[in-house]
């Protein structure tokens, strides 16, 4: 049986309400296509409010307090815990990762065989996007492969206003790409997602698009400011799409505790499963058995 490749795209700080729905103003034809052809989880709740605990949970399906250890003033992934990526490696997958240098501390070199870190100054529109495309097209990735891409481009919103305009994408200057800078950056990211997706064979590749956590920056109505952090920081988006595999054309679903989505992917793609995890598996949702997860 031919094993399916996995393109695992994580957009750091991508809020759910800015990914899907009539209130978003960004222009995202490629993200929209993934949602239309895949399974979109409308209310995915993150496991933490920072990158390292969230990513650690994604890789292990454990809560951050279970899979992280303290190293001085910082936390890192417990090296004694096997990650889902390790199980993919053990089942013949060639694992690759592109991530910002700050993620080194998680232990990415121990998790993935091939790592490609980039500096904080590098974004999709000034070299990183082309570098990712080169990785996909230079024939160094052996099938079946798993390619984890962690994009920090949304953090541009935290730059001072003038610096944001100076180093940001062309879309950030044009209102047609969104009502605020946050959504215009999303529009710019979507352009590069389209270029990346053009370089893979969707007939034999499962595409996962998700986030680690939300972010507070953006446009809010007065009512939004009254909501608890759960609404603007902990709700993120998650989409699992394989346009050529009808089993995943299931429309919108409700899901919580997002880290468990790697469990059914492991089981379906490589006959792998974990016997230790604190999240509910999404397999029944992906197979159409459950319409909602409570």
Where is each model-derived feature located?
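Catalytic domains that recognize anionic headgroups
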Residues: 1-294
């Amino acid at each position: 049986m031919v094993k399916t490749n996995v393109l695992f795209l994580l957009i750091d700080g991508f809020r759910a309400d800015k990914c899907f729905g009539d209130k978003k103003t960004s222009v995202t034809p490629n993200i929209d296509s993934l949602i239309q052809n895949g399974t979109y989880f409308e209310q995915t709740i993150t496991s933490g409010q920072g990158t390292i605990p969230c990513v650690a949970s994604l890789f292990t399906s454990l809560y951050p307090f279970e899979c992280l250890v303290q190293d001085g003033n910082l936390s890192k992934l417990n090296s004694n815990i096997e990650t889902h990526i390790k199980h993919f490696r053990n089942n013949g997958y060639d694992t690759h990762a592109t991530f910002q240098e700050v993620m080194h501390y998680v232990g990415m070199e121990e998790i993935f065989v091939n790592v490609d870190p980039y500096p904080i100054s590098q974004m999709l529109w000034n070299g990183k996007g082309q570098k990712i495309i080169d990785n996909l097209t230079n024939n160094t990735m052996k099938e079946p492969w798993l390619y984890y891409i962690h994009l920090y481009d949304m953090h541009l919103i935290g730059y001072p206003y003038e610096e944001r305009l100076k180093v940001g994408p062309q879309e950030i200057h044009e209102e047609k790409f969104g009502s605020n800078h946050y959504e215009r950056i999303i529009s710019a990211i979507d352009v590069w997602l389209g270029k990346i997706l053009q370089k893979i064979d969707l007939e034999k590749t499962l595409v996962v698009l998700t986030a680690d956590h939300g972010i507070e920056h953006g446009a809010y109505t007065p009512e939004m400011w009254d909501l608890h952090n759960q609404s603007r920081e902990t709700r993120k988006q998650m989409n699992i799409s394989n346009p050529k595999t009808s089993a995943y054309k299931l429309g919108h679903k409700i899901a919580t505790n997002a880290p468990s989505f790697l469990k059914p992917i492991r089981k379906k793609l490589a006959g792998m499963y974990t016997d230790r995890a604190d999240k509910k598996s999404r397999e029944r949702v992906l197979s159409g058995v459950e319409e909602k997860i409570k």
